[in-house]
Amino acid sequence: TPEQQRYVELFIVVDHGMFMKXXXXXXXXXXXIHQMVNIMKEAYRYLYIDILLTGVEIWSNKDLINVQPAAPQTLDSFGEWRXXXXXXXKSHDNAQLLTSTDFDGPTIGLAYVGSMCDPKRSTAVIQDHSEIDLLVAVTMDHELGHNLGIRHDTGSCSCGGYPCVMSPVISHDISKYFSDCSYIQCWDFIMKENPQCILNKR
């Protein structure tokens, strides 16, 4: 049944700029990440997906990839790094890079679509675009949604009168609900592609 629970083991990397922004305190950065992942759990409950934080790596000395304003290049480099280097890191299904770099144009996050469990492409890059953890967490929800095969909502999609997570435009109202379309697209992807890595929780 589609309702069979799925588990996304999430690995988060905090880049050097974001580490410095958080007053170079690793504890502060880690606490913020835990908060954001708890917010993500709420949204994903509706999709019958549990988000498990399996690791946080903080690039406290220097960035291990070239983090640049061109989001597609940064996403590509991060994917290469994950496939090559992070194998050493704990087993995980999906990795997100949080950066203080201001991406070109209105972009605040970028992810491959329908790439969950792919060694290189099960990744996303997220700009730490707000002082409000909640707003950044919604962007994390949104990009992970793309990895799970969810596209942007169109006019006919709804999530009960609230702003929806997969809306193409960022809303300053907090969107913590996935739309009916998102639900269908996510489970279409899971049933068709059957990404194996999200069946277990370790």
From Swiss-Prot:
Any one of the GO CC terms: plasma membrane
Domain Peptidase M12B: 6-200
Keywords, sorted A to Z: Disulfide bond, Fibrinogenolytic toxin, Hemostasis impairing toxin, Hydrolase, Metal-binding, Metalloprotease, Protease, Secreted, Toxin, Zinc
Active-site residues, as the UniProt record annotates them: 143
Domain of life: Eukaryota
CDD domains linked: ZnMc_adamalysin_II_like
Binding site for Ca(2+): 9, 93, 197, 200
Disulfide feature: 117-197, 157-181, 159-164
EC number: 3.4.24.-
Major subcellular location class: secreted
Expression by tissue: Expressed by the venom gland.
Name assigned to this protein: Zinc metalloproteinase barnettlysin-1
Annotated organism of origin: Bothrops barnetti
